[in-house]
């Protein structure tokens, strides 16, 4: 379990409207990032980490993308160079290690940039409700510290019988 601080990443679109395009989670450099959901790894960029100091955004960032069975994609950004453990075409399960986070050269320090999007939406953006605690779901509040937790029943929710058996054999 890790303490995560949620920060909205806004994008200024047409006519100045703002929309949430992702979530930022404070991390410690070198932390392992785990899959939020299972799916197919569709894209990996593993050698483009920014070396600019004290930056807020950079056009080159290491990331990976996972396609989910419901048609959504998750994008995980700011991995260390050569720090991603998975490859395109690989199936991942919830809770599987994906890679080592970087981003310590950013103004906000090391952090994960996480977004979920739907290609069939006009603006592609989508921020789902999260399990904020074992008793509560909803949208996280900006700059509030949340503790991550990974209950087995949630991790296994989308798994096939074969994946569940494999997962439980590691427990």
Task: Kindly label every feature range from the protein language model.
Residues 1-61, 94, 146, 150-171:
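Surface-exposed, glycine-biased beta-strand/turn segments
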Residues 17-20, 68, 78, 111-113:
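Histidine-centered active-site/metal-ligand motif
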Residues 28, 34-35, 70-95:
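Short histidine-centered loop motifs in beta-beta connectors
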Residues 43, 78-81, 103, 118:
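A residue-level detector for short acidic-glycine micro-motifs
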Residues 58-72:
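OB-fold (S1/OB) nucleic-acid-binding surfaces
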Residues 64, 93-106, 114:
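Short hydrophobic beta/alpha edge segments that flank linear recognition/processing sites
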Residues 84-96, 111, 115-171:
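Acidic, glycine-rich catalytic/binding loops that coordinate metals and/or anionic ligands
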């Amino acid at each position: 379990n890790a303490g995560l601080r949620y920060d909205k990443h806004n994008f200024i679109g047409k006519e100045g409207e703002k929309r949430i395009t992702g979530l930022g989670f404070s991390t410690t450099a070198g932390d392992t990032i785990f899959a939020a959901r299972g799916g197919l790894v569709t894209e990996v960029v593993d050698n483009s980490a920014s070396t600019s100091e004290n930056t807020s955004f950079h056009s080159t960032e290491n990331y990976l993308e996972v396609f989910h069975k419901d048609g959504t994609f998750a994008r995980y950004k700011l991995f260390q160079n050569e720090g991603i453990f998975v490859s395109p075409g690989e199936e991942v399960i919830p809770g599987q290690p994906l890679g080592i986070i970087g981003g310590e050269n950013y103004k906000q320090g090391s952090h994960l940039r996480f977004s979920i999007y739907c290609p069939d939406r006009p603006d592609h953006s989508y921020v789902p409700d999260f399990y904020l605690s074992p008793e509560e779901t909803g949208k996280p509040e900006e700059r509030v510290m949340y503790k991550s937790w990974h209950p087995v029943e949630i991790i296994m929710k989308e798994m096939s019988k074969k994946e569940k058996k494999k997962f439980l054999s590691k427990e």
